[in-house]
Amino acid sequence: MKNLRNRSFLTLLDFSRQEVEFLLTLSEDLKRAKYIGTEKPMLKNKNIALLFEKDSTRTRCAFEVAAHDQGANVTYLGPTGSQMGKKETTKDTARVLGGMYDGIEYRGFSQRTVETLAEYSGVPVWNGLTDEDHPTQVLADFLTAKEVLKKDYADINFTYVGDGRNNVANALMQGAAIMGMNFHLVCPKELNPTDELLNRCKNIAAENGGNILITDDIDQGVKGSDVIYTDVWVSMGEPDEVWKERLELLKPYQVNKEIMDKTGNPNVIFEHCLPSFHNADTKIGQQIFEKYGIREMEVTDEVFESKASVVFQEAENRMHTIKAVMVATLGEF
């Protein structure tokens, strides 16, 4: 699909259903080729900058492995690895990196930052995560659901439970609308997505034969789901009072066996973008337990470790789908 050549990947809302389907099909093809040893490098002699204002395990590893598999060279610029925002404007950084690199990945805070990089760099820019959006994650989520459920995308009933305002919830709603899915967002009313985004997604869903439901009624929201999805409730760096208020709001929305059973679907699967606070076995998890008495946050360990959980297949698919995005926008077919 030549019209993806040299395009940036900033938000799924920039892409048509046909284009998203193309990226997902290409992901399947590249994954198959890697598994059977027939992968052909289509990014040979390309130089890629990975610009991270936020640390990451999956996003960094996915981009680096995908790039190396495809023959590209990678430079990682971590939170202290560039002058962007400190001694140099985003606009200037974009023009500097655009003169040296063939593509730029950005993972950080503001959606406006990744948009500025795309506007001024002159090369494809890929959104690895912002506070508002997480489009590469959604490609992996959808691919995993199709692989496990053996259903067409439009036939998947996809439900997100938790903080309806966060970047993953936003991106999933966008993607589901584009793909014509039946999408439910189950969250407290105080954490509903913005009206602007919701109305836009509802219009897109209607055009594609899909449906979007926003509800705080857990029973109504999860009934008939093929996928139950959640994400962490809090982010590092937020004030204590924000954590306390949000934890109280979201306690009833913890994904546990009861919620999985309420779907009425014995084949329902559980997805999560990771990392997850499903126990107190991490430094942050222990701090949360000591301060708030919560040992399991957004999902119980029982569900996380159950046969319904596909989170590690989903994590692997970050690499295959990110590879597809880079190949489609930068590769030599």
UniProtKB/Swiss-Prot annotation:
It comes from the Bacteria. Its EC number is 2.1.3.3. The keyword Cytoplasm applies. One of its GO terms (molecular function) is ornithine carbamoyltransferase activity. Keywords: Amino-acid biosynthesis, Arginine biosynthesis, Cytoplasm, Transferase. It catalyses: carbamoyl phosphate + L-ornithine = L-citrulline + phosphate + H(+). GO terms for biological process: arginine biosynthetic process via ornithine; citrulline biosynthetic process; L-arginine biosynthetic process. It is found in: Cytoplasm. PANTHER family: ORNITHINE CARBAMOYLTRANSFERASE, ORNITHINE CARBAMOYLTRANSFERASE, MITOCHONDRIAL. Reversibly catalyzes the transfer of the carbamoyl group from carbamoyl phosphate (CP) to the N(epsilon) atom of ornithine (ORN) to produce L-citrulline. This is Ornithine carbamoyltransferase.
